[in-house]
Amino acid sequence: MGVDFELGSVPELLREPLARWWERAGEQEGFLDLYAALPENLRAELPRVAAGSEFAASVLIRDPWALEWVNRHGEPEAARAANADYETRAASAAVAADAQRLLREWRRREMLRIAWRDISGRAAVAETLLALSELADGCIRAASAAAGLQLHPVFGKPCNAGGDEVPLIVLGMGKLGGRELNFSSDIDLVFLFSEKGQTDGPREIENEEYFNRLGRDLIRLLDVRNEDGFVFRVDMRLRPFGDSGPLVVSLASLEDYLQEHGRDWERYAWIKARAILGADAYAPTYQEFVRPFVYRRYLDFGVIDSLRDMKALIAREVSRRELDQHLKLGRGGIREIEFIVQAMQLVRGGSDKRLQNASILEVLPLLAGSKLATASDVAELTDAYLVLRKAENGVQMIRDEQTHSLPTEPVDLVRLSVNMGVADWAVGSARIDAAREQVARQFGAVLFGAADAPHRHDEAGAG
């Protein structure tokens, strides 16, 4: 096609499908000119990105101009400025279909940029997790604003008794709350509002009804899959009473729920709660109700018993569904690291406010300083977490699928090796196995005491 494209940098098993992709990409209008305009380093990186990620390869077929996005906005600061522009455009879209299109185009291009930096090795794991979380935050803010634009002409603004506007509060939970979102993840959200009242438009409705309409429309803008794809799958099950509860609840109802019905597992969940919208309105409830619910004033060693119960439930599910190769739920997986950190947060967080933090990576170094773990254990857990999150993202980058299980097809194991930046799957597998052994040993020590924990294998510690 008159433009050099180097296949030799990718494993042999991936060269034939990559060559077919290159032929097809070259047929797309503008692709070769955009490719030729790339700096040398991006041209050198593209073969591994397209070989490791069918998602990235498909984006470049569908949207060749995404190459220019990567070229112009590749570095994090440049990307933040460009993302802010997309957020403004999507938020001000007067027609829902336009908002949907802009959000999906934005997501497609920014996810390509994030995958490209990750696979090429230019982004550390922490950068990738933060970039994914910032993209989700921006899409949520834009979708909320766009949904509001559709409602305002009919209903006006939701107001309290004094006529002041009442905001929607959106909490990010789970990995989104900790700003550590994985590549193809659901986003766990909770919708709240601060005060009852009525809207001030031509058709007056109660604030609760307004926010339920707004919440449904927000979810639809993000979650619906159409010819442009989707933005984020939205999971609302962490709200009070789960699927049986209202979509949007008042702060007063949340306060009552936590006091009367809050369960131990919900304390773990609410560690992660972070206000994406409506932070000022949420802050008093967090200080007076959520924080005391999560973090007790006394040393709370009872959380270990509840942790054992939760782990037993997960272990039964892993066995039933044959999830031994599950990076999240399997033995020594990501969930066990989260449990270790969160258990220590719940035990000591009431007396040590530094531990009141939704980020695993930010809390881990504090554990050694709080004498909750040795410096070597913290270093081991941190390394294991980064290995497992790199592998998890690598699996999901293959096809933008929400999976946490290691592939079984040889070609996908090679793709995962590319995405992890290792020479071959033997190296990648050994690295994952070593990380899981380290995690399992420490998790056993937390649950049952060091004497009952599995012995650490010498070779496991070498990874």
Task: Give residue spans per PLM region.
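A nucleotide- and high-energy phosphate-metabolite-utilizing enzyme signature
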Residues: 1-463
